[in-house]
Amino acid sequence: MKALDKETAIARMNTFGRNGTPFLFVIDYMQEHSYVEPLDGIDTSVCLYQFRGTGNAPDAGARYAGTIDWEFTPPAPADYRRSFNTVRRNLLGGNSYLTNLTCKVPLRTNLTLKDVFLHSHALYKLWLKDRFVCFSPEIFVRMEEGRIKSFPMKGTIDATLPHAESILLDDAKEAAEHATIVDLIRNDLSMVSEHVTVASYRYIDRLQTNKGPILQTSSEICGMLPGDYTKRLGDILFSLLPAGSITGAPKPRTMQIIAEAEGYERGFYTGVMGCYADGRLDSAVMIRFIEQEDGQLYFKAGGGITAQSRWESEYNEVIQKIYVPIY
């Protein structure tokens, strides 16, 4: 698989869509490196994918028979607070209303990247040999029959807590964060479609993990695409990037704040992955992500920060998200 620059990736997606060629796409956070490959040309020794039960790895999701060793080194609280304060200063200064702050966390486990792919349970999974594995629960956009839909996911809580669902839905900070991202995604979809509406607001998803169940809130936003959209799949998708749920609002200024606060390169983490086949485009945000660098594994995780956020709660949410859905 050959990495492509932005312009080449857009043109390739447009061509495949125009010709009705089924293809896989993987796009990094900054849209500087992308893979766009016809499905029948993917080498399974290098790349495996499974998106909502469809892919090139029929054994994906098989039960893991062994014991999982899982240790990680979270950021020092002082380091996280320093990054948090950079974000908060900009929030209070009016430069952003919502900023997604993420971390790069060293991980030690007996699982290989391929093990995680084969045995994890997630809506969207991708493995690139010796690079990374992603097991994402978050849909980015779907395009089908002239409609585009997006499903931003914001708000997380331990499902074992008493009254967890009510606590999550009643949390003022989580509600404000979710409202902001829904408004951002609605505006994004309005750039490429018409008659944009919020079809469902703050519904609850339950996710199983190796550390226990969690609850997350999502919304569904829909719009009507132009008649020639299959000929412009690359143009449409790239115009929506990076995903609003993993940047914030307003997007351009917030990305500058992220670069200042995080101090590392996200790479493919928080990019998007997906495929196009039979007239349908399906994609996911690349969250829940383990990367391999020089033999060391890193779990990348984060969450949305608003002016109402407390650093301790956000720090604990990052730790809560460092899991694998193997059970």
For each feature predicted by the language model, list its residue ranges.
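Extended alpha-helical targeting/anchoring segments
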Residues: 1-327
